[in-house]
Amino acid sequence: MKRLACLVCSGTAALTAHAEFDANRLWVNAGFYSAHFDTDQGLRNANPGIGFEYRIDDTWSATAGRFRNSNNANSNYVGAYYQPWTWAGVKLGVVAGAFNGYPNAYEGGWFPALIPTASLEGQHWGLNMALVPPLKDRLYGAVSFQLKYRFR
């Protein structure tokens, strides 16, 4: 955990050194709503939380946050969106990062993830959509939706 925190701080410092912070690029993200593929598992669909997403350019953004996951445990995440394609105004790509807090996945510890994503962004409101693949008996798959807001 300490190593991950150091990595995030180092990345943030490098970003700050590269470009000046622009508040217009910062999104505040709510938790998630997850439509699970396995509806009979008693999973929590509403996953409240808070996160932040900083749009570095039209293709890249950095993200981190905390939410109550589908197993009713607290989870943290950190990652980077790479969305090089746009179709009908929707950004398409992946988010690569790490999650923790899932009791059946790596004993609740941190694990890597690569998740297909689509994002729709307006002037103030946006929506991230993710296709979370199932991971055997460790993580249940879902289509997840994350509402976001930008103060401009």
Predicted features, each with a name:
Residues 1-23:
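Cleavable N-terminal export/targeting peptides
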Residues 15, 19-20, 56-58, 81-87, ...:
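Outer-membrane beta-barrel proteins
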Residues 18-66, 76:
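Short glycine/proline- and aromatic-enriched beta-strand/turn motifs that initiate or cap beta-hairpins
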Residues 26, 58-62, 88-90, 120-129:
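Repeated loop/turn-to-beta-strand initiation elements of outer-membrane beta-barrel proteins
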Residues 27, 32-35, 140-152:
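Outer-membrane beta-barrel "beta-signal"
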Residues 30, 50-54, 64, 78-83, ...:
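Residues on the lipid-exposed face of transmembrane beta-strands in outer-membrane beta-barrel proteins
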Residues 30-34, 64-66, 94-98, 129-133:
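Transmembrane beta-barrel strands of outer-membrane/channel proteins
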Residues 37-45, 67-76, 86, 100-111, ...:
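Solvent-exposed loop/turn segments connecting transmembrane beta-strands
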